């Protein structure tokens, strides 16, 4: 179990208890599906995946959550509403704290992972509520499984949440919304590195793994009318 990163709000007890049951189950299911579908695919890529999307709010400048909007809860509820607009009914949005949210996208088409983040960030960038509160939106996501050998211990689900956080914290944004995602790279088939080795390395230095093609890092570019 990984330690909580510095300056990150801990997961409330109710959310923690839910994730301790739900997320390991979904990870195991994603592992089994990947092993079955990749065995039928010429490039051993999974037909579906699990998307872990971490949404974080931060002040562009000044104080956290300035006064005019009547408190934190309205902004937090607004972010949850934005998430529900871009995910399906079968997906799960979770409020980790007022500043941080998690969305678990089940049985996701790997080609659709980028679109989900792009749509959400476009809506966040256009939000009058977030604009009035002077807040920036960051999204980091992990497309699971990351390896053709998906053997990551599912009880260590917090590590994957931490990895999504790490992706949300990449680079210094210039606008009101930014996002980065992590997914398996083209060299993964040849390497066959198991997730039990890959994911701890990714948490320390995803860029090094991306340079050798074991992983890919996607940067979300906002487009008009997305």
Model-derived features: positions:
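Active-site/pore-lining binding-face segments in mid-to-C-terminal subdomains
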Residues: 117-122, 138-141
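A short glycine-enriched loop-to-beta-strand structural element that forms part of the catalytic core
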Residues: 51, 95-106, 131-167, 178-189
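Short catalytic/binding micro-motifs of nucleotide second-messenger systems
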Residues: 33, 85-90, 122-132, 170-171
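Catalytic/regulatory signature loops of cyclic-dinucleotide turnover enzymes
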Residues: 128, 159-191, 197-217
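C-terminal output/effector regions of signal-responsive regulators
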Residues: 29, 45-52, 62, 158, ...
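Conserved long alpha-helical elements within nucleotide-processing catalytic cores of c-di-GMP signaling
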Residues: 9-31, 35, 44-54, 58-84, ...
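Flexible loop/N-cap segments at domain edges
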Residues: 73-74, 78, 88-89, 104, ...
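PAS-family sensory modules
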Residues: 1-38, 43, 75, 199-223
